[in-house]
């Protein structure tokens, strides 16, 4: 069976180190999820695993770098790789989309390897019946094994079932790829990746654009996969459901524990077995140990330095010996010098041992997200929450033909509401109506307090009302405090990573004097650490909050009111 093995892998883009001394194994039964902050190198690691990039040093073994001609003369890599948010098989027929191609042409190209394999199998079967030879029999055995691995006999059935499960069953196959939405294209490529049955499955954010049924189908497929699965995801419920282990590319707390114990600590990734919940507990415990170790070490360091300083003085500094003991002064001075020197040397040795195992200061709060506790209104006074009474938002029979089924609810000042519903149920339509007014074809009534601020689900663009114009040229400045790392404050907004652009949106929204703060898909683009931090600060925030999300992890742990939209429109 296939196994992906990284051994002391280093990789950089030019002079910028990305991966440093990364080692791990992903075996046939592993569903290994790579996690870490935005920009740390998760997608780069997947590209290395699929053979699309070569490491600076170290070795990578596995299907992507093993013999790609499993069944001559059929040429196809044995692994599959998916670009961020756009699952994409790595074999040549899918390498790069041509917008003029149709859905049918893409499907034909993606399944051509399996169909060629089946044709080769039929040819060998007939040929061996007429003129058998040891060479042909050996090839027949290899082809048969590959047919079984790929389940080639059921490719048409599996194709239809997978397209249906990913909400593509009714897709017109004569349509050009350019006419598909980004979500449709992403789901189509994911479907073709799964149908192709590579030896190893390598996926980057595979649940993007999937509804609940699609995520469940993908989870079942991964459970049943005959081979290693290596992937990244920010979908915590999906990770909880599928992962057998997580690989953290930010091993800071585990390094600190290793340093304190005198063990090697130059590893660039740390593996935690089990589910996402197991990972959270392990990471929290490691961070707690790191914090406690640092505090104990600093206290011991201060004690040793103080003792070393005091050891230079024996007795009382202002004491003058009496006449009768002056004769012994040299004797006592020599003895004091010996004691002092021994104490100083002992302290120096202890300080050297401590320095060898001294851990860096924990800085786990620096990447945290935090809303201001007091929000001011545009008139200069404090906002109505948390003390004001009454209704901040009332929705009465609101509907939009073909986009939003009739819905009604109320939100009082200081309350938190989560709007849930399947893809296409109108979550975004509803939030945009509340923030910007009724769209064409709207019916019913929406009455909201003045000062509604909406963070859209997409990344910011020039001209967005939430973003000051100068942020695109000068950066977000101190407005990013509590959201964006200080090193990114003075960089133009468009140069920031997707995760930091999302943080910037949240930062401006939190400081926008909002009577009602609305966030459409708050978990989009954020890494797992940021997601956990954002949830904590939203939970503690005293303002009026309305969010929409498909994040099942957040929905099942939601602390406020929950309103589900009807799929019928």
For the regions a protein language model found, what residue spans apply to each?
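ABC ATP-binding cassette signature C-motif
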Residues: 1-289, 377-569
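Flexible nucleotide-interacting loop at or near the entrance of a catalytic core
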Residues: 132, 138-164, 169, 287-403
